[in-house]
Amino acid sequence: MTTPSPTKKAALAEPKLFSGIFSLGTDAVEASAIIHIDSSGELVFKFSSIPYKAQSDFISAAWHDPSSDVVHFSFKAVAEDGARFETDHLFFSGLGMTSPEDAGTLLTPEARCAKGTLRYALKEPFPLPALRMRLKGFRNFGSLHAECALGRLEMNGPHEIDDEDDAADGWLVVQAAEPPPDDALWHDESEKLLEHVRRIMSFATASLLRVPIIEYIAGSESEVTVWFQTRQRSGVMPVFHFLAHDAIFAAAVGSYFSPPIVVKHLFFAIEWFAMEGTYNEIRLVNAMTALENLIDSNVEPSEALILPRAQFEKIRRVLLSVIRTCLGKWTAALANDASLELKEKLADLNRRSLLRKLELLAARWKVPLDGIDPASLKAAKQARDKVVHRGQYYEDARETDADLWTHVTIIREVAVRFLFTAIGYEGRYISHVGGYHDAVFPPAVKSAGETH
C-alpha cells in the first residue's frame, strides 16, 4: 500500500492562505482566509477582514436576518501553490465589525463549514487510484489487511489507552491493484465497499465510527472532501477487543462481495446497535430497536401474520358481527365509539408477536440461540416496553425481577448473533451475558449430560 499514513494528533492539513470569491446567490465579494483541517477532521477558517461596502452588505444582512434558518454561503478560492478550495456550505458562527481609523468599517466572519473540498496537485503521478476514509474512534493494534476484486484494503487506528476519541487518526483505505478500466465506476464501488466495512466495524466496536474526511488520490491530484461531524465517543460494550479485529474485518470485507444472507436495512440495525447510550434504559431501547428493525424488515409475510389475510378476513367479519351484537345493549354513543376502536384493534389479532417473529426468523436464518433462556428474553422485552411506554423500569419492580443491566446484555447478545449470522462471521467475541467474558460463535452445542 503506497498511500501515506495520516499524522496522528497533528493538523490533517496545514494552514494555507486561499483567496477567491465569497458569495450568496448573485451577491459576491473578494475574500481571503487561512484554512486548515484540525486533528478532529474539521475545517478551520481565519478570514481576513472584508471592507463593509454596498457590494459586501449581503454578508451583514444575512447575519442580522431575524429568520432562524441557517444561511449557507459559497467560497471558492485558490492558494499560491495552486491548491483549490470550494464549498457551498459555509455558515457563520459570528460576525465581527470594527472601524479602525482611516479604514472604514470592516467585517470579519467567523465561519464553519458543513462540507468543503480541497484539491491538491501531487508531486508525483499516482497511477493506481486510492480512496481513503479518515476515521474517528477506531482503535486497533497494527494494521488490518485484505485483498478483494477492487484492490487492497488496509485499516488502522491508534492503540494507546489515552488516545483521544475525537481525533481523526484512524483510517480505512482501498487501492486498486491495477489501473481500473473505468475510474469513476471504481470510485463509486470502492466507496460502497468502504462504507460497508465502516458500518460492520462500527458494530464491532459498538460505536458509530465517524468519517469527517474522504480522500480520493488518482493521477496528478488529491481530492479531499471534509464534513462537519459531531464529537466521537467510545463504545461502552464493544463486541471485540481492539487487539482482536482481524476476523471481523475479514468478515466485513467478505460479506460485501458474498453476503451469506441478503439482509434488508442491515445498516439501520447497526446504527441503532452502535448508538451512544448513557443510561441502561437507553442501551436497552437501542439494542431492542436494532433487533426489531432486523426482524420487521426481514420476516416474510407468512411469518409476520398468523393466518393468510384472506382467511383472517372471514374470521374478522364474524368477530365484527359478534361485537355489534354485544354492543347493541349499550347506548348509541358508547356503542359507536367502542365499535370504531375495536374495529381498529381486530387487525392486531392476526399479527404475530415480536418474540414469535424472532423465533421464526432465527429458524430461517439458522441463528443459534443456544444459552438464551426464552423466559429471560421475554422479561427483557417487557422491560423495554416499560421504559418506552412509561419512561421507567424500576418503580414497581419486584426483588425477584432481573436488574436492567441483565436485560440489556440479553437483548444485545441476541442482536449480536443475528448480525454475526447476517455477515457470516465465525470466531471469538466478547459476550456480556452473565458477566464480561470471551465467547465463540457459533456456540458449541452441549452434549447430553454436559453441564458446563
Write out the residue ranges for each language-model feature.
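Long, contiguous, compositionally biased segments that the model treats as domain-scale units
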Residues: 1-200
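Internal, Lys/Arg-enriched amphipathic helical interaction segments that engage polyanionic partners
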Residues: 183-253
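Sequence-level detector for tyrosine residue identity
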Residues: 52, 58, 63, 75, ...
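Amphipathic, oligomerization/interface secondary-structure segments
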Residues: 233-452
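Short, charged N-terminal helix-start/capping segments
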Residues: 4-16, 24-28, 107-111, 199-218, ...
